[in-house]
Amino acid sequence: MESFSSKSLALQAEKKLLSKMAGRSVAHLFIDETSSEVLDELYRVSKEYTHSRPQAQRVIKDLIKVAVKVAVLHRNGSFGPSELALATRFRQKLRQGAMTALSFGEVDFTFEAAVLAGLLIECRDVLLELVEHHLTPKSHGRIRHVFDHFSDPGLLTALYGPDFTQHLGKICDGLRKMLDEGKL
């Protein structure tokens, strides 16, 4: 017997459509101004660190696609009780990572790449577990790409180094605002 669900089909179509349109206009439906500013700074950091505009664009585009898809899944009530617990755990880990990043940015000589990288890897693993049955292997690859990129100890060390002070300041300002507003 074939099981058919129009809700499932509609959700699949919505995710497919949004993945094709993961540009700025669709992102504004799910990503506010502060988040957009942080993403712009992360793009600049990635571009300067990798010396590759296409690579920086790809990682931010993957991040936006994943964020939009997870938002659609959450908005449509696709997560069961155990998955909602995972979503809460992911949010807590992300919040912990943001507070750690802020602390490292505000207190001189406290930065440890391994600590921040470890938190990002934990976030990646929880998110992968959360979306395991909802997103395709291609989307799982996007999640790995984004978190592996930003948890690179070399990138993190550069971000907290003297050449990226301006970018780090703007990222910290955005993270602080998002934490204050309860968006992280």
Swiss-Prot record:
GO BP of this protein: innate immune response; negative regulation of inflammatory response; negative regulation of T cell activation; regulation of apoptotic process; T cell activation
Domain of life: Eukaryota
Subcellular location: Cytoplasm; Nucleus; Lysosome
GO CC list: lysosome; nucleus
InterPro entries linked: TNFAIP8-like (IPR008477), TNFAIP8_sf (IPR038355)
UniProt family annotation: Belongs to the TNFAIP8 family. TNFAIP8L2 subfamily.
Name listed for the protein in its UniProt record: Tumor necrosis factor alpha-induced protein 8-like protein 2
